[in-house]
Amino acid sequence: MTINTNNLTITISAASKKQYPENDWPEIALAGRSNVGKSSFINTLLNRKNFARTSGQPGKTQLLNFYNIDDQLHFVDVPGYGYARVSKKEREKWGKMIEEYLTTRENLKAVVSLVDIRHEPSEDDLMMYEFLKYYHIPVILVATKADKVPRGKWNKHESIIKKAMKFDSTDDFIIFSSTDKTGFEEAWEAILRYL
């Protein structure tokens, strides 16, 4: 499959199942903690500066944003989890919305689960990974912000993340930086394998 990343539009921001796009294009969901670099990851893969809005304010994405890529594929930006300044009720609402999408959407081919390479995975990161494994949803685990860690320490950080998450070696693990595009090719290769 050849994808022209210049042909991009936002299809819809959906709050529930009835708003999901009705076509049968494959979908790749992107999930991670607030401020893990999800928007930067999307923008880097699509060679755009501000297609997915980056924000210094965590918790900005509150709906499922469906990005149409070349009329062939949707990236689905999932609300960032683990953000404290959102009410418990709001977090529960997001949780239900995310769970409904991940467990019922037939178009979903894989989830890019993003973690920050600098830190041990959070409780939320572990829960998301376990959830995806439980439902047999293919996972591409992406460790972001690699430019913030000396290259010589990448292996150590990778080991810490994999151990904490009880990483399944059949999943992809990609070290990524939106600053210098480390992992750009590997990320696209992993995504295209699921389409």
From Swiss-Prot:
Alphabetical GO biological process terms: division septum assembly
Record function comment: Necessary for normal cell division and for the maintenance of normal septation.
Entry keywords, A to Z: Cell cycle, Cell division, GTP-binding, Magnesium, Metal-binding, Nucleotide-binding, Septation
UniProt key word Glycosyltransferase: no
Gene Ontology annotations for the cellular component aspect, listed alphabetically: cytosol
Organism name: Lactococcus lactis subsp. lactis (strain IL1403)
SUPFAM superfamilies per UniProt: P-loop containing nucleoside triphosphate hydrolases (SSF52540)
Entry-linked HAMAP family: GTPase_EngB
Cofactor: Mg(2+)
Protein name: Probable GTP-binding protein EngB
InterPro entries: G_ENGB_dom (IPR030393), GTP-bd (IPR006073), GTP-bd_ribosome_bio_YsxC (IPR019987), P-loop_NTPase (IPR027417)
Keyword Metal-binding included in the entry's annotation: yes
